[in-house]
C-alpha cells in the first residue's frame, strides 16, 4: 500500500523530532510534517486544514507542548480520513467515529493537554481565546518520554510544574469532582510536592522528570 500518511505537528527547532522522522522513513511510510508556532492561532490552524484538505490522513502525531497537542487534536477531530475539512464551530456535534487516530507526545509537564477532551486556540482577529470540548479530542495513545522534557530550563520547568499543580488543585476543588478525579488530583499533588524541589535542583535527572510528567 501507500503506507502511513501522518501530518506531524511539532514545535520549531526540536531536534528530538528527527528520531521520529528517521523511524518513519525507515518504515517507508508517507508522511507530512507541519511545524507550528509556539502559540498557534485560529488562522494557523485553518492553514493546516487547507494544506491537508485533500490528503488521505490515517494518523496524526503531535510532538510538543500543550498548544501543539491541541492543534493536533483539533485537526484530527475536524478532518475525517479521506474527507474534507469540517467547520470547527460544529465540533461539538461530531462523533468519535469521525476523528483520525491520534498519538500525543508531550514535551512539557504542565497543561496535561495530552490527557484531556479539551482544546484551546487563540484568535488573532477577535483577540479571543476559544475552548472546545468533545470526547473525540482525547488522543487514542499518549507516550510519556521524560527525556523529551530535559531541554526545559529552570524557569520553564518551574512554571510548567506549577501549572500542573494548579490544574490538580482546581480539579480537586471542582464542584463536579468525583471519586476518580479526586484520587487523581491528590496523587498529582502528592507527586509534585515530593518531587518539585528535587527536580529544580537536578534538572537533568530523568527520574524526577518522569515523576513531573506523570503528575501533569
Where are these regions (language model features)?
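Short Gly/Thr/Asp-enriched flexible loops that form oxyanion-binding sites at enzyme active sites
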Residues: 49, 68-81, 115-118
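Glycine/serine-rich anion-binding loops at beta->alpha junctions
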Residues: 57-73, 107-113
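Catalytic cores of large soluble enzymes that bind and process phosphate-bearing ligands
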Residues: 12, 37-40, 153, 157, ...
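A glycine/threonine-rich phosphate-anchoring loop and its flanking beta-alpha core
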Residues: 81-179
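Active-site segments that bind and position negatively charged phosphate/pyrophosphate groups
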Residues: 171-216
Amino acid at each position: 500500500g501507500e503506507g502511513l500518511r501522518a501530518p506531524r505537528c511539532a514545535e520549531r527547532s526540536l531536534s528530538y523530532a528527527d528520531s521520529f522522522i528517521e523511524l518513519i522513513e525507515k518504515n517507508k511510510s508517507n508522511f507530512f510534517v507541519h511545524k507550528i508556532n509556539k502559540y498557534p492561532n485560529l488562522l494557523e490552524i485553518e492553514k493546516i486544514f487547507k494544506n491537508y484538505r485533500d490528503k488521505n490522513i490515517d494518523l496524526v502525531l503531535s510532538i510538543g507542548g500543550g498548544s501543539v497537542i491541541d492543534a493536533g487534536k483539533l485537526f484530527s477531530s475536524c478532518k475525517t480520513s479521506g474527507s474534507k475539512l469540517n467547520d470547527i464551530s460544529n465540533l461539538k456535534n461530531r462523533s468519535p467515529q469521525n476523528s483520525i487516530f491520534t498519538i500525543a507526545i508531550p514535551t512539557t509537564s504542565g497543561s496535561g493537554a495530552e490527557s484531556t477532551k479539551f482544546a484551546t486556540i487563540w484568535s488573532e482577529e477577535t483577540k479571543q481565546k476559544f475552548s472546545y470540548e468533545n470526547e473525540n479530542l482525547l488522543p487514542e495513545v499518549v507516550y510519556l518520554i521524560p527525556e523529551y522534557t530535559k531541554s526545559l530550563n529552570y524557569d520553564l520547568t518551574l512554571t510548567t510544574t506549577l501549572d500542573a499543580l494548579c490544574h490538580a488543585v482546581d480539579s480537586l476543588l471542582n464542584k463536579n469532582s468525583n471519586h476518580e478525579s479526586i484520587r487523581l488530583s491528590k496523587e498529582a499533588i502528592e507527586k509534585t510536592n515530593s518531587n518539585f524541589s528535587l527536580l529544580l535542583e537536578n534538572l537533568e535527572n530523568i527520574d524526577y522528570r518522569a515523576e513531573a510528567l506523570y503528575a501533569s
